[in-house]
């Protein structure tokens, strides 16, 4: 909005302590900020701050509370267009892992990934993404938990599984391929032939919560011998702000959508807290990541914000921040 005011402008109710949560249908309900417990003046101040730091750069911000839109800003961009979620997609990967474990397709987060996707070990020296990156014997013990928590050390000689927090893409690709393979949806010999992990997400989450997002595979430019079918083909979701809000609302409600437990609640509780691997092996300032989510329970990511807050974040300033 050009005046940087919240979408809704007429104050109604100041006390929102008894406001009930609702779920969107085809679209979201909108409400006055005060009705949802927001201070209109502070929202306006936040909008002006965003405008000042953005300058001429486009941006979109959507604020939801109790299942209703409280404020929205769109500057030089179409609010209905889709944006690549980049690494913010990893939080959705985590959600599907939790579902796959509940369904018994993956027996445990602590299972060895190579038991489901042995191809991950078939990357010799000279076949990885660059010099020094290849699958080595210790990678055979990597677990699903280590992959989603970015502590796997996959194709990182010298990094023992579960010991080093190293934010990476290729380990996440192994995660999605292993899960999709367990559902018989991915083949390294022809990655684009199978339905893929993105379609699995549509079946297990998107269609159940009324989302509209699409997905695509992405690859970095690599040398000719790189085994992209094994460790490439990243699943990336293309979402509108309202799609992002649906995912955030699902996560904030511990995986529940209007009474349907889409993602196991116990998985969401676990995934949105800093992992034990990071707590045990990294210094306090790196106590920032759970199982596919940026987590604040150790007050390291956002020291001045509530400890129960967490986020999906990706390149291009793609963020879904939730505060239960």
Predicted regions and their residues:
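Flexible, glycine-rich surface segments
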Residues: 216-278
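Active-site helix/loop module of the DD-peptidase/beta-lactamase fold
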Residues: 84, 103-154, 184-234, 266
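Solvent-exposed loop and edge beta-strand segments that line ligand/cofactor-binding
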Residues: 83-84, 136, 159-167, 230-238, ...
């Amino acid at each position: 909005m050009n005046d940087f005011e919240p979408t809704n402008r007429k104050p109604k109710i100041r006390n929102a302590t008894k406001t009930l949560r609702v779920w969107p249908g085809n679209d979201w309900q909108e409400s006055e900020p005060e009705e949802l417990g927001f201070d209109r003046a502070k929202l306006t101040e936040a909008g002006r701050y965003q405008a000042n730091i953005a300058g001429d750069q486009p941006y979109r911000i959507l604020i939801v509370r109790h299942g209703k839109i409280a404020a929205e800003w769109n500057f030089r961009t179409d609010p209905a267009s889709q944006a690549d979620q980049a690494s913010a997609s990893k939080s959705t990967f985590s959600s599907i892992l939790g579902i796959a474990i509940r369904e018994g397709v993956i027996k445990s987060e602590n299972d060895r990934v190579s038991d489901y996707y042995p191809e991950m070990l078939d990357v010799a020296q000279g076949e990885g993404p660059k010099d020094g990156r290849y699958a080595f014997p210790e990678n055979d013990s990597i677990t699903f938990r280590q992959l989603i928590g970015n502590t796997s050390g996959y194709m990182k000689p010298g990094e023992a599984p579960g010991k080093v927090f190293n934010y990476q893409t290729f380990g996440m690709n192994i995660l999605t391929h292993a899960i999709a393979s367990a559902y018989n949806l991915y083949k390294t010999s022809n990655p684009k032939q199978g339905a893929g992990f993105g379609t699995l997400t549509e079946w297990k989450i998107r269609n159940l919560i009324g989302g509209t997002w699409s997905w695509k595979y992405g690859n970095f430019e690599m040398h000719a011998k790189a085994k992209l079918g094994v460790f490439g083909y990243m699943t990336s979701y293309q979402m509108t702000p309202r799609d992002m809000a649906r995912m955030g609302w699902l996560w904030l409600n511990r995986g529940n959508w209007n009474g349907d437990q889409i993602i196991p609640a116990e998985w969401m509780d676990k995934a949105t807290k800093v992992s034990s691997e990071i707590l045990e092996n990294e210094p306090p300032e790196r106590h920032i990541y759970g199982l596919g989510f940026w987590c604040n329970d150790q007050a390291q990511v956002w020291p001045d914000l509530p400890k129960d807050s967490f986020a999906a974040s990706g390149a291009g300033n793609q963020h879904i921040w939730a505060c239960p």
